[in-house]
């Protein structure tokens, strides 16, 4: 289902340019602050493809920057973007800020090795996928196959991004209940590579991180 976006939606933020000033996309940056669905990820996919195939070779960026603040959304749309990110010849740095949750976290973890940055006050939510379905018995039984495939995709993605074993992933990142993390807990679990403010080069020490209290 398509939704009406506010005037400050991600595509407006990234396309704005005053006069002759370049837009964020022109500078190799994209700010994603939205739910994850086909409408919201399509502009990011197009941006990555344009940077790889449309921009003249001599003008291509050495690195792309994708900043993410998302409460999550559709898994299929997330994996569509993830596959495009992984196929990019230009490394993609990811910066998580505000909140990266559910499928938004999956997208963040896909950033280039050593280039996944969390800001100190970012909230991280990792949990099992949820799925609502209806239909006749034989239709629901057929859907079980996709449940199994989705679970396999999730585990493979977490494993490749964190280098944790399946047992540890299920215990610390995909347990039965939601798992909220602060930036330093995420760092220890291999979700990110560094904790820093977007324009800061030195990592932020643990003492400066605001702790997140969860219910």
Model regions and ranges:
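Terminal-region recognition feature
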Residues: 1-215
């Amino acid at each position: 289902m398509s939704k009406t976006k506010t005037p400050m939606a991600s595509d407006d933020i990234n396309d704005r340019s005053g006069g002759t000033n370049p837009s964020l996309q022109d500078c190799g940056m994209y700010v994603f602050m939205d739910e994850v669905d086909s409408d919201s990820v399509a502009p990011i996919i197009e941006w990555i493809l344009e940077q790889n195939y449309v921009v003249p070779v001599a003008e291509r960026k050495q690195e792309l920057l994708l900043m993410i603040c998302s409460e999550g959304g559709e898994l299929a749309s997330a994996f569509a973007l993830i596959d495009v990110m992984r196929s990019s010849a230009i490394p993609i740095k990811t910066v998580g800020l505000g909140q990266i949750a559910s499928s938004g976290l999956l997208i963040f973890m896909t950033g280039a090795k050593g280039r996944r940055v969390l800001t100190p006050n970012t909230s991280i939510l990792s949990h099992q996928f949820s799925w609502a379905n209806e239909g006749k018995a034989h239709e629901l039984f057929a859907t079980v196959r996709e449940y199994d495939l989705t679970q396999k995709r999730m585990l493979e993605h977490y494993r490749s991004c964190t280098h944790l074993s399946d047992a540890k992933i299920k215990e610390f990142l995909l347990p039965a209940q939601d798992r909220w993390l602060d930036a330093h807990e995420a760092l220890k679990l291999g979700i990110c590579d560094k904790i820093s403010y977007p324009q800061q080069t030195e990592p932020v020490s643990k003492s400066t991180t605001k702790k997140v209290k969860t219910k």
